[in-house]
Amino acid sequence: MANIQDFLTDNMLSNLESAASLAIHSKNNEVVPLHLLWALSVDSTSILNQILNKLNISKEALELEIKSRISKLATSSNVNRENIRFSNELINSLENAKGLMSANGDSYLSVDTWLISESQKSPIKEILAQFLDLREFQKELESLRAGRKMDSKTSDETLDSLNKFGIDLTLKASEGKLDPVIGREEEIERLMQILIRKTKNNPILLGEPGVGKTAIVEALAQRIIKKDVPKSLQNKKVIALDMSALIAGAKYRGEFEDRLKAVVNEVIKSENIILFIDEIHTIVGAGASEGSMDAANILKPALARGELHTIGATTLKEYRKYFEKDAALQRRFQPVNVGEPSVNEALAMLRGIKEKLEIHHNVTINDSALVAAAKLSKRYIADRFLPDKAIDLIDEAAAELKMQIESEPSSLRKVRKDIETLEVENEALKMENDEKNQKRLDEIAKELANLKEKQNALNSQFENEKSVFDGISAKKKEIDLLKNEASLAKARGEFQKAAELEYGKIPSLEKEVEILEDKWKKMSENGVLLKNQVDEDLVAGILSKWTGISVQKMLTSEKQKFLEVEKHLKESVIGQDKALSALARAIKRNKAGLNADNKPIGSFLFLGPTGVGKTQSAKALAKFLFDDEKAMIRFDMSEFMEKHSVSRLLGAPPGYIGHEEGGELTEAVRRKPYSVLLFDEVEKAHKDVFNVLLGILDDGRATDSKGVTVDFKNTIIILTSNIASNAIMNLSGKEQEDAVKNELKNFFKPEFLNRLDDIITFNPLGKDEAYEIVKLLFKDLQMSLENKGIKASLSENAALLIAKDGFDPDFGARPLRRAIYDLIEDKLSDMILADELHENDSIIIDAKDDEIIIKKA
């Protein structure tokens, strides 16, 4: 046995071990050639099965014949790994194959050599002859070998490399497994133009992730099947190379190179294969180790001679990183730039794949849902690209609906749970036999009868709806298959078959679908348990889960929303009508498209004394625009007073501690691209902070320390400052305006001030505003009390007293909040702790003799 192992390939040895396991399973005390043939037939990746698939021969029939013959062999009850042995017949079989191996000039015996040897004589020849033509079988085995020598134990792993390490996209296209590709005509034409060149006929598709590079290659495969390509490309096959499969399991040095070289040789020999390598930058350095070449260097000679037709695909970033450094590799590929499609182009692509998505998910997708997916994904998902993000959105919306359809309807689930609850109660009451319980048992019996009747009715309705639903889905799938068959028939010139399908079977099925859809429509009018329409609300709901932005805000008309911005701000901020009007006007200008597209939504400098509503305005704006006060990201600029602290905004440079964490500003915006950025007390910051802000205000983006560009176009930037507070407090009109301008010019650089959309002055508050602010602040206290079940109201006298006692023009509105704490909340907390206030109580907060009194209503 040891001598036999020395000349067997690893694959052959593995199959012999499988044969021994099968012999033990069959209780045969010897391993014979039949066991080895059986082992090959059950291994789906074996050479035997590859040939059976090519020749369209049933492996199940072959397996039955083998098992039938094995059942006639001698058996033993105590066969195990220790006492199983190779029969003389098998050893002779391997020795005979070894002779053929030597004649072929091989150093090791592989499975294909053994099969050729056995198909010339022996009982195995009789079995194979029942199912296939032996000459054709031997010819296919020799074709797989393609003249290669078995000079290592792993050499036969490279047989039929393209089947092992590649995916035939033209085969997938012929089976209708690829989605239709809409648009991209220019890129596909350029791709074909490069492919039919004499040399350097290798295009490389360059574009951002998700723009549709792979889809362009799939479109080429579909065109080849339909013969919609130049004559020189009509018989080509597009094979996608699976780099992970190529590298996986390559245990020994040189094994990866052997596999890749085998693939290259197969492609060169066939002359009709176009190799597609997605993420082609992975070949640079792949397999390289001390004393061995990387994959790129193996491909270069064949690429330069034009013997290897290759299409690559990678991103611009990876192309610059890997290809531009290797000039020899770069010049062997011709770039084809694939840009991000517009919203309208992405919408056309979505409409193209709509039918496939509907068939897969068994739902109907409204056109409004496609429009919403294209527009909302463009607006709200800034770090990804069309059409991928829009396709993902519509696909997930359809998946959510499919999950609902395949689950028990909520109304049916509720009835079932009610029945279960009553049955549990029924069993519990039966244990206690008294008059009161008997009365309740009678009630439960009636309720259960009603619920079970309702459950039966709902079940019946659900089954009827499901049968119509499944019928529509099955017919649509059949139509899709027939359409693909008709398309292939046309490409093959079988016009009679195409006509039979297009004018016979397909219209007949479409009529059946129409009848079922009419039936569904009538059922829908009476109310249905199953929802089968993917609409814009569902799409917006999915996007809301992704981004955290409210669904209602997405679907509200943008114009209508921004027309109301001033009104909403004035509800939250008191006494700053002029400042809020200026803020609202600037935002409306931006949203009307009168500002540059590459800038933030708005950038403002809020000036004014403390406590006048600068920060509150920013919070109110965040709440209105993004439906969440937490959408305001606040930076206390007193933390950035020193030069070294400025790097915290964009991140520490490479080599410094904290580099991997990124910048506080850039990371915050990457996580929440739709937000209000508040830079509080900006005059305290180091002057270098303003250099960082210049680029953001001008271009709407910033590059962090890791080289990642962060988009600020969906943010509102607000800077607050107490500069010129004295002038604002003590002056008014033109005099105030001039004094403020002079102080700003003395502190800020002109280029910084020029980049701001507006400088907004917040004026000091008066006693009238203080009264309104007290009423606004009291609403927060009211809500807290309502959560405890206590209703509270504030009298006018009490509000006036709090405004009088708490207002200080030098400190603005902040002392008013402290006055509410001192005058109201302290007394309320004492009453609650003393059990003087309970749930469902109502109180009135009033004032008498300059003192706040709290009384129950």
Curated annotation (Swiss-Prot):
Residues 558-764 are annotated as: NBD2. It is found in: Cytoplasm. The keyword ATP-binding applies. Residues 391-525 form a coiled coil. This is Chaperone protein ClpB. One of its GO terms (molecular function) is ATP binding. Its main location: cytoplasm. Residues 160-340 are annotated as: NBD1. Residues 4-147 form the Clp R domain. Residues 8-73 are annotated as: Repeat 1. Residues 765-857 are annotated as: C-terminal. It holds the Pfam family AAA. Keywords: ATP-binding, Chaperone, Coiled coil, Cytoplasm, Nucleotide-binding, Repeat, Stress response. Part of a stress-induced multi-chaperone system, it is involved in the recovery of the cell from heat-induced damage, in cooperation with DnaK, DnaJ and GrpE. Acts before DnaK, in the processing of protein aggregates. Protein binding stimulates the ATPase activity; ATP hydrolysis unfolds the denatured protein aggregates, which probably helps expose new hydrophobic binding sites on the surface of ClpB-bound aggregates, contributing to the solubilization and refolding of denatured protein aggregates by DnaK. ATP 1 binds at residues 207-214. The Clp repeat (R) domain probably functions as a substrate-discriminating domain, recruiting aggregated proteins to the ClpB hexamer and/or stabilizing bound proteins. The NBD2 domain is responsible for oligomerization, whereas the NBD1 domain stabilizes the hexamer probably in an ATP-dependent manner. The movement of the coiled-coil domain is essential for ClpB ability to rescue proteins from an aggregated state, probably by pulling apart large aggregated proteins, which are bound between the coiled-coils motifs of adjacent ClpB subunits in the functional hexamer. The lineage of its organism: Bacteria, Pseudomonadati, Campylobacterota, Epsilonproteobacteria, Campylobacterales. One of its GO terms (biological process) is cellular response to heat.
